């Protein structure tokens, strides 16, 4: 267990050192590849979390993940900060379409499904995507353009 925490912390340090401390992000947010991220330890429903993110920063949404590297970053940050099994992401199914769409309007390109559903969270420990009823409460990560 100690080795896992040490390695996870090491990965977090590497990600943060690569991202720098860019001035484009609000205080308590961190910069990574042109976006600002912040983990919130305030359990909310998926819809309330998305609304909250949109109120925190211009262009803010629940986090969208577009690569394995970004998924790893989000998983490590969420687990290191929250140690929560439920961390909402901005992925949901639009009722009148058959396509999965991120809350920022981007189409799904990278996938890491554990199972199918309507609102998706990332398991912070295993970094897998799972589904839950959207009415459940979970912690969340917000993302906005830098």
Curated annotation (Swiss-Prot):
InterPro entries: C-type_lectin-like, C-type_lectin-like/link_sf, C-type_lectin/snaclec_domain, C-type_lectin_CS, CTDL_fold
Signal peptide residue numbers: 1-23
UniProt keyword Signal, yes or no: yes
Subunit structure as annotated in this protein's UniProt entry: Heterodimer; disulfide-linked.
Lineage: Eukaryota, Metazoa, Chordata, Craniata, Vertebrata
Note: Shows greater sequence similarity to the beta than alpha subunits compared to other heterodimer snaclecs.
Protein name: Snaclec 5
Tissues of expression: Expressed by the venom gland.
SUPFAM superfamilies, per database record: C-type lectin-like
MF-aspect GO terms: toxin activity
Pfam families reported in the protein's UniProt record: Lectin_C
Primary localisation category: secreted
Domain of life of the source: Eukaryota
Family affiliation: Belongs to the snaclec family.
All copies of domain C-type lectin, residue ranges: 32-143
Keywords, alphabetical: Disulfide bond, Hemostasis impairing toxin, Secreted, Signal, Toxin
GO CC, one annotated term: extracellular region
């Amino acid at each position: 267990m100690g080795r896992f925490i040490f390695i996870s912390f090491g990965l977090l340090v590497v990600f943060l050192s690569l991202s720098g401390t860019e001035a484009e992000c609000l205080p308590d947010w961190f910069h990574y590849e042109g976006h600002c991220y912040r983990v919130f330890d305030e359990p909310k429903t998926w819809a309330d979390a998305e609304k909250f993110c949109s109120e925190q920063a211009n262009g803010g949404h629940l986090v969208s993940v577009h690569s394995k590297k970004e998924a790893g970053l989000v998983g490590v940050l969420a687990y290191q900060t929250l140690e929560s099994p439920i961390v909402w992401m901005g992925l949901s199914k639009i009722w009148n379409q058959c396509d999965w769409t991120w809350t920022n309007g981007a189409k799904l390109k990278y996938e890491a499904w554990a199972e199918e559903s309507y609102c998706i969270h990332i398991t912070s420990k295993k970094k897998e995507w799972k589904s839950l009823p959207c009415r459940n409460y979970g912690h969340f990560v917000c993302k906005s353009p830098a």
